[in-house]
Swiss-Prot record:
This is Flap endonuclease 1. Pfam families: XPG_I, XPG_N. Belongs to the XPG/RAD2 endonuclease family. FEN1 subfamily. The gene is dnr-8. It is an enzyme of class 3 (hydrolase). Mg(2+) 2 binds at D179, D181, D233.
Length: 394
């Protein structure tokens, strides 16, 4: 899921784009969260016996437990979360979804075998692979959020794309997801690990798109071409193309069209492009995703007072949660929702958009950086050729 190896490319090429910090550093900020990705992470947090959390009736409750307590943790730290759920997947994603379904079926068979003959590690590994987020999981989490007074929206298609729209329009500070393709949808800031448990002690990663592009010396179109070449959810990857090769090819040839042209003409035949590889369609999905505009009435979000008695009815009487814990958490949520109304200092200052002259200057800077990197690649190639041509022992 997402873009293969993109984080390691950014870490190597644009380290200044990544900031790490504690959850409390996000105090006073509104954040749009990829709900489906979060629910999936709650569901794969299986116990050592390979089972998900269940109530006495045998119903899975991992998703509700995760959504309830992780959301409480965010609000405790002064964050105002809003969740974005996936709608229907784009047609181009159907191939990837079919593959995931096949992998899950194979994992289910592997899980049964591991339960009979394998170790605890095998059971846990296969349990994770069988997990999928269902409509029921989504519906129950939406019901829970409504009772908590936390807003949510269902995206027309990809949740990450909708999160990016809201962040770009300034409705939220950032988009939060583990999927790196959120950056391809033009999210100015991506937060990762925001919904992780406190026990994992993972710092919150804050990735700034503008600094990513600057570090790579690329404009957005080139960046998306790089991401498609690295491997995205919409297309099969090209065999033998890893992160360093993908980066080198985009820097040398400039566009995916020219990379494909070069691959097809390569006399050594090193790369086999999959037969059905509509990269132009994938690029269009990143540039023109099906999303609700930020000024859509459904994007007018409101954080409400939690319905504590409703939470008791749903979580305690229907799902078997502890009444004392839910009541205590509900009271704390109500109190923290009031304090999270406090704004950060930067919220009082309006960020002025760049002038046309500033945009042109920024574009020139990126082009110069790209040219320098292309020259460097050419020089490295020449050096390698010289070394190869040198007689041994010379």
């Amino acid at each position: 899921m997402g873009i293969k190896q993109l984080f390691s490319v950014i870490k190597d090429e644009a380290p200044d784009a990544i900031k790490e910090g504690e959850i409390k550093n996000q105090f006073g900020r509104k954040v749009a969260i990829d709900a489906s990705m979060s629910i999936y992470s709650f569901l794969i947090a299986v116990r050592s016996d390979g089972q998900q959390l269940m109530n006495e009736a045998g119903e899975t409750t991992s998703h509700l437990m995760g959504m309830f307590y992780r959301t409480l943790r965010m609000v405790d730290n002064g964050i105002k979360p809003l969740y974005v759920f996936d709608g229907a997947p784009p047609k181009l994603k159907s191939g990837e979804l079919a593959k995931r379904f096949q992998r899950k079926q194979e994992a289910t068979e592997g899980l049964e075998e591991a339960k009979e003959t394998g170790t605890a590690e095998d059971v846990e590994k296969f349990s994770r692979r069988t997990v999928r987020v269902t409509r029921e999981h989504n519906a129950e989490c939406q019901k829970l959020l409504k009772l908590m007074g936390i807003p949510y929206i269902v995206a027309p298609t990809e949740a990450e794309a909708q999160c990016a729209v809201l962040a770009r329009a300034g409705k939220v500070y950032a988009a939060a997801s583990e999927d790196m393709d959120t950056l391809c949808f033009n999210a100015p800031i991506l937060l990762r690990h925001l919904t992780f448990s406190e026990q994992r002690k993972e710092p919150i990663q804050e990735i700034h798109l503008e600094k990513v592009l600057e570090g790579l010396g690329m404009e957005r179109k080139q960046f998306i071409d790089l991401c498609i070449l690295l491997g995205c959810d919409y297309l099969d990857p090209i065999p033998k193309v890893g992160p360093s090769t993908a980066l080198k090819l985009i820097r040398e040839h400039g566009t995916l069209e020219k990379v494909v042209e070069w691959m097809k003409a390569d006399p050594k035949g090193r790369y086999q492009i999959p037969e059905d590889w509509p990269f132009e369609d994938a690029r269009t999905l990143f540039f023109e995703p099906d999303v609700r505009p930020a000024d859509d009435p459904l994007c007018d979000f409101k954080w409400d007072k939690p319905d504590i008695e409703g939470l008791i009815q749903f979580l305690v009487h229907e799902k078997g949660f502890s009444e004392d814990r839910v009541r205590s958490a509900g009271t704390k949520l109500e109190k923290n929702m009031k304090t999270s109304q406090q704004a950060r200092i930067e919220g009082f200052f309006k960020i002025l958009p760049k002038t046309e002259e500033e945009k042109k200057a920024h574009k020139r800077k990126l082009e110069e950086q790209a040219e320098q990197k292309r020259k460097k690649v050419k020089e490295e190639k020449k050096e390698k050729a010289k070394l190869k041509a040198k007689p041994r022992g010379a």
